[in-house]
Amino acid sequence: MLAATGSLLATIWAALHPRTLLVAAVTFLLLADYFKNRRPKNYPPGPWGLPFVGNIFQLDFGQPHLSIQPLVKKYGNIFSLNLGDITSVVITGLPLIKEALTQMEQNIMNRPLSVMQERISNKNGLIFSSGQIWKEQRRFALMTLRNFGLGKKSLEERMQEEASHLVEAIREEEGKPFNPHFSINNAVSNIICSVTFGERFDYHDSRFQEMLRLLDEVMYLETTMISQLYNIFPWIMKYIPGSHQKVFRNWEKLKLFVSCMIDDHRKDWNPDEPRDFIDAFLKEMTKYPEKTTSFNEENLICSTLDLFFAGTETTSTTLRWALLYMALYPEVQEKVQAEIDRVIGQKRAARLADRESMPYTNAVIHEVQRMGNIIPLNVPREVAMDTNLNGFHLPKGTMVLTNLTALHRDPKEWATPDVFNPEHFLENGQFKKRESFLPFSMGKRACLGEQLARSELFIFFTSLMQKFTFNPPINEKLSPKFRNGLTLSPVSHRICAVPRQ
């Protein structure tokens, strides 16, 4: 009987034309994709996408935050997108953003992971972890940052010292055109390095420069089209050369750098006298040798890299935007310098306490953040359980993107939404906080380094404005054009830093 059945199947298989098999296979895959991605009842409206890739090719990967704005007008303040294998919704408007990120944050607390991100982090660290791992790592990171100076005079003094190193590095340019990218990266990175590694690096240190270069590359390469194709077809793309392979190589080199730093720490580690984040983490690991918590070597590497990345890229990118806008708006730069001269003078180092007496400078920094808009769709969240938002059903696993671009350019909130205008943050000459200003997000998953970033921005920006006037090079035109990556950064440009007399 079995032999007869097998013979019959073999006969049928042999009779089938390869074209028939191909059509059957494609039909099966299309049906599987349809049933996997079909919209549930009360799901937010949105554009129909192609099988397997969804709406990816309907977005401009050079400016995805801008290409979704017409969809807001068409579908409303909450609409859906299918980004390959990831179902997502985009929310627009302060009321909806507040509801999603604060009032309902227990339901929308997780972090979605692309295939690429999961391979890189394995759900570890601070940025891309969720659940108990995230809670443990965030609590420990906040405590350790405070223990090693956050909000204290000691860290402020480190910022002042680093600002003086940055001033001297820029002074060496002698007022000639230069690219400020890595000078600023060096300075900002050294602050978080002093907390994580317990030391600052010389600006010419080859290991330090290599680490910053690798980080800068992955910031851009992770958002390229070929990287997105890897997220959709990893079983194919892993065999194909391309920029996605460089992303993995770079992250392995970054992990190796941190691993070597950890080994160096172990050589003279004293658990009773932790010097930095790595020492403190090593001590925490000894409390849980059975790996009952997330305090293990893999999380130490990932959390250290997350602090290094978050503590370097966002602040340094904002400072680069700040210098660019000062060169583009010399009248604003003059007002900032006049306030600095009046409150601080030309000799004394800037202090955080000066910020209260410098409303215009503070307003300029905030306006740079608004216009720079460096994380235009916020860091994504993921729905942890089936949730209803604004009358729409969001199934568990849906990615939530926050439309900060629309919020920071809302004509109902800002007098001149598309024009650099520090008056947005001033009222009767005093600094004015704005509710529709969320560069650090909101809720429990808001940026844990917000206080550090605000302090760095003020100290570094004020120190540079105190010592230099920034101008466009002769016969070179500057513009606020951006390069898309994990953050929006200014396109590569040169600038002149003329010492002030």
Curated annotation (Swiss-Prot):
<dbReference type="InterPro" id="IPR008071">
    <property type="entry name" value="Cyt_P450_E_grp-I_CYP2J-like"/>
</dbReference>
<dbReference type="GO" id="GO:0045722">
    <property type="term" value="P:positive regulation of gluconeogenesis"/>
</dbReference>
<keyword id="KW-0503">Monooxygenase</keyword>
<keyword id="KW-0256">Endoplasmic reticulum</keyword>
<keyword id="KW-0492">Microsome</keyword>
<dbReference type="GO" id="GO:0019369">
    <property type="term" value="P:arachidonate metabolic process"/>
</dbReference>
<dbReference type="InterPro" id="IPR050182">
    <property type="entry name" value="Cytochrome_P450_fam2"/>
</dbReference>
<dbReference type="GO" id="GO:0007565">
    <property type="term" value="P:female pregnancy"/>
</dbReference>
<dbReference type="GO" id="GO:0001523">
    <property type="term" value="P:retinoid metabolic process"/>
</dbReference>
<protein>
    <recommendedName>
        <fullName>Cytochrome P450 2J6</fullName>
        <ecNumber>1.14.14.1</ecNumber>
    </recommendedName>
</protein>
<dbReference type="GO" id="GO:0032760">
    <property type="term" value="P:positive regulation of tumor necrosis factor production"/>
</dbReference>
<keyword id="KW-0408">Iron</keyword>
<dbReference type="GO" id="GO:0005789">
    <property type="term" value="C:endoplasmic reticulum membrane"/>
</dbReference>
<dbReference type="GO" id="GO:0003958">
    <property type="term" value="F:NADPH-hemoprotein reductase activity"/>
</dbReference>
<dbReference type="GO" id="GO:0032966">
    <property type="term" value="P:negative regulation of collagen biosynthetic process"/>
</dbReference>
<dbReference type="InterPro" id="IPR017972">
    <property type="entry name" value="Cyt_P450_CS"/>
</dbReference>
<keyword id="KW-0560">Oxidoreductase</keyword>
<dbReference type="GO" id="GO:0035359">
    <property type="term" value="P:negative regulation of peroxisome proliferator activated receptor signaling pathway"/>
</dbReference>
<feature type="binding site" description="axial binding residue">
    <location>
        <position position="447"/>
    </location>
    <ligand>
        <name>heme</name>
    </ligand>
</feature>
<comment type="similarity">
    <text>Belongs to the cytochrome P450 family.</text>
</comment>
<dbReference type="GO" id="GO:0005783">
    <property type="term" value="C:endoplasmic reticulum"/>
</dbReference>
<dbReference type="Pfam" id="PF00067">
    <property type="entry name" value="p450"/>
</dbReference>
<dbReference type="InterPro" id="IPR036396">
    <property type="entry name" value="Cyt_P450_sf"/>
</dbReference>
<dbReference type="GO" id="GO:1903055">
    <property type="term" value="P:positive regulation of extracellular matrix organization"/>
</dbReference>
<dbReference type="InterPro" id="IPR001128">
    <property type="entry name" value="Cyt_P450"/>
</dbReference>
<dbReference type="GO" id="GO:0005506">
    <property type="term" value="F:iron ion binding"/>
</dbReference>
<keyword id="KW-0479">Metal-binding</keyword>
<keyword id="KW-0349">Heme</keyword>
<dbReference type="GO" id="GO:0008392">
    <property type="term" value="F:arachidonate epoxygenase activity"/>
</dbReference>
<dbReference type="GO" id="GO:0016712">
    <property type="term" value="F:oxidoreductase activity, acting on paired donors, with incorporation or reduction of molecular oxygen, reduced flavin or flavoprotein as one donor, and incorporation of one atom of oxygen"/>
</dbReference>
<keyword id="KW-0472">Membrane</keyword>
<dbReference type="GO" id="GO:0020037">
    <property type="term" value="F:heme binding"/>
</dbReference>
<dbReference type="InterPro" id="IPR002401">
    <property type="entry name" value="Cyt_P450_E_grp-I"/>
</dbReference>
